[in-house]
Amino acid sequence: MKIIVFGAGAWGTAMALSAAAHPAGHAVTLWARDGRQADAMQAARQNARYLPGIAFPAALALASGAPSGALASCRADLAIVATPMSGLRGMLEELRDATIPVAWLCKGFEAVPAGGETAAQGLMAHEICSQVAPRLRAGALSGPSFALEAAQGRPTALVAASRDAHVRELLVEAFHGPTLRVYANEDIVGVEVGGAVKNVLAIATGLCDGLDLGTNARAALITRGLAEMSRLGLALGARAETFMGLSGLGDLVLTATGDLSRNRRVGLALARGLTLDQAVESLGHVAEGVYSARTVVRRAGQLGVDMPIAREVVALLDGRSTASDAVARLMGRSPAAELRSC
């Protein structure tokens, strides 16, 4: 199979490496928007910026330039979009006439700026695709995964999500191998809600750990956060069982507890007294939870879904609250039944 990965960040590079190492002998092209980055990776045969020290196999080619031109030149059977959420709309617009399946790796909602939004903001990835490239056969590859571990060939499990059975099957064929298990799921709404909400919740657990509130508090945040994720997903049309799977519980546990989690590290930084800008700058990478948190809370409000943890995260990010005030409000809420539908 011929595969092209658009986006040479950590995760795009990791997935290109995984595909290039597949026993089936895939021919893989890793595309970088910056031609200088592509040249540097070609010369060093590694991505020194995002995954230093991990060598590129001979089966991995490099490309840059116009995405449509790169797609045509490599004659790919499958295109993977590995941009952040902020770049997904533009990339799908460039690939809107592609005749091969396209899948994205980003997790989140389009960002809604403080104080407003436009009709082009606040959507999940599959909604963006339906809006700008409705003819694409498309899906998502998601689940609990840190780029470094996947690139190192450590055991990882992901979910190939699409309403199109052919897309699911092609993603499994492309990536399922000795170190990467890929499960198929037609519930793309549930998979994308899980991938978005877990980032917001990981900021909360980072704050919890940074404030040394204890493991009891962390367990409570993860569990009640999973309830918030499930309520929003069900209201958006997802299946309940999806949230007990890799893209729900699995991704939440990893992102909320793992030291490589960017969103958790934002929470840790805020707990140390850094401003949001300082916390984001210290990462050097995108933390999607910072940008999609407002959308999560807005869509929950539109649907009448109660998400108190996510709401407190947004108040903190917007500078309208402090961590201690957020804890006091969450603990001071009226008693409620553990299991409820909204």
Curated annotation (Swiss-Prot):
<comment type="similarity">
    <text>Belongs to the NAD-dependent glycerol-3-phosphate dehydrogenase family.</text>
</comment>
<dbReference type="InterPro" id="IPR006168">
    <property type="entry name" value="G3P_DH_NAD-dep"/>
</dbReference>
<feature type="binding site">
    <location>
        <position position="261"/>
    </location>
    <ligand>
        <name>sn-glycerol 3-phosphate</name>
    </ligand>
</feature>
<protein>
    <recommendedName>
        <fullName>Glycerol-3-phosphate dehydrogenase [NAD(P)+]</fullName>
        <ecNumber>1.1.1.94</ecNumber>
    </recommendedName>
</protein>
<feature type="binding site">
    <location>
        <position position="262"/>
    </location>
    <ligand>
        <name>NADPH</name>
    </ligand>
</feature>
<feature type="binding site">
    <location>
        <position position="33"/>
    </location>
    <ligand>
        <name>NADPH</name>
    </ligand>
</feature>
<feature type="binding site">
    <location>
        <position position="262"/>
    </location>
    <ligand>
        <name>sn-glycerol 3-phosphate</name>
    </ligand>
</feature>
<dbReference type="GO" id="GO:0047952">
    <property type="term" value="F:glycerol-3-phosphate dehydrogenase [NAD(P)+] activity"/>
</dbReference>
<comment type="pathway">
    <text>Membrane lipid metabolism; glycerophospholipid metabolism.</text>
</comment>
<feature type="binding site">
    <location>
        <position position="198"/>
    </location>
    <ligand>
        <name>sn-glycerol 3-phosphate</name>
    </ligand>
</feature>
<dbReference type="GO" id="GO:0046168">
    <property type="term" value="P:glycerol-3-phosphate catabolic process"/>
</dbReference>
<feature type="binding site">
    <location>
        <position position="286"/>
    </location>
    <ligand>
        <name>NADPH</name>
    </ligand>
</feature>
<comment type="function">
    <text>Catalyzes the reduction of the glycolytic intermediate dihydroxyacetone phosphate (DHAP) to sn-glycerol 3-phosphate (G3P), the key precursor for phospholipid synthesis.</text>
</comment>
<dbReference type="Pfam" id="PF01210">
    <property type="entry name" value="NAD_Gly3P_dh_N"/>
</dbReference>
<dbReference type="GO" id="GO:0008654">
    <property type="term" value="P:phospholipid biosynthetic process"/>
</dbReference>
<feature type="binding site">
    <location>
        <position position="263"/>
    </location>
    <ligand>
        <name>sn-glycerol 3-phosphate</name>
    </ligand>
</feature>
<dbReference type="GO" id="GO:0005975">
    <property type="term" value="P:carbohydrate metabolic process"/>
</dbReference>
<dbReference type="GO" id="GO:0051287">
    <property type="term" value="F:NAD binding"/>
</dbReference>
<dbReference type="InterPro" id="IPR008927">
    <property type="entry name" value="6-PGluconate_DH-like_C_sf"/>
</dbReference>
<feature type="binding site">
    <location>
        <position position="251"/>
    </location>
    <ligand>
        <name>sn-glycerol 3-phosphate</name>
    </ligand>
</feature>
<feature type="binding site">
    <location>
        <position position="107"/>
    </location>
    <ligand>
        <name>sn-glycerol 3-phosphate</name>
    </ligand>
</feature>
<dbReference type="InterPro" id="IPR013328">
    <property type="entry name" value="6PGD_dom2"/>
</dbReference>
<keyword id="KW-0594">Phospholipid biosynthesis</keyword>
<keyword id="KW-0520">NAD</keyword>
<dbReference type="GO" id="GO:0046167">
    <property type="term" value="P:glycerol-3-phosphate biosynthetic process"/>
</dbReference>
<feature type="binding site">
    <location>
        <position position="143"/>
    </location>
    <ligand>
        <name>sn-glycerol 3-phosphate</name>
    </ligand>
</feature>
<dbReference type="InterPro" id="IPR006109">
    <property type="entry name" value="G3P_DH_NAD-dep_C"/>
</dbReference>
<dbReference type="InterPro" id="IPR036291">
    <property type="entry name" value="NAD(P)-bd_dom_sf"/>
</dbReference>
<feature type="binding site">
    <location>
        <position position="11"/>
    </location>
    <ligand>
        <name>NADPH</name>
    </ligand>
</feature>
<dbReference type="InterPro" id="IPR011128">
    <property type="entry name" value="G3P_DH_NAD-dep_N"/>
</dbReference>
<dbReference type="GO" id="GO:0006650">
    <property type="term" value="P:glycerophospholipid metabolic process"/>
</dbReference>
<feature type="binding site">
    <location>
        <position position="288"/>
    </location>
    <ligand>
        <name>NADPH</name>
    </ligand>
</feature>
<feature type="binding site">
    <location>
        <position position="145"/>
    </location>
    <ligand>
        <name>sn-glycerol 3-phosphate</name>
    </ligand>
</feature>
<keyword id="KW-0963">Cytoplasm</keyword>
<dbReference type="Pfam" id="PF07479">
    <property type="entry name" value="NAD_Gly3P_dh_C"/>
</dbReference>
<keyword id="KW-0444">Lipid biosynthesis</keyword>
<keyword id="KW-1208">Phospholipid metabolism</keyword>
<dbReference type="GO" id="GO:0005829">
    <property type="term" value="C:cytosol"/>
</dbReference>
<keyword id="KW-0443">Lipid metabolism</keyword>
<keyword id="KW-0521">NADP</keyword>
<feature type="binding site">
    <location>
        <position position="147"/>
    </location>
    <ligand>
        <name>NADPH</name>
    </ligand>
</feature>
<keyword id="KW-0560">Oxidoreductase</keyword>
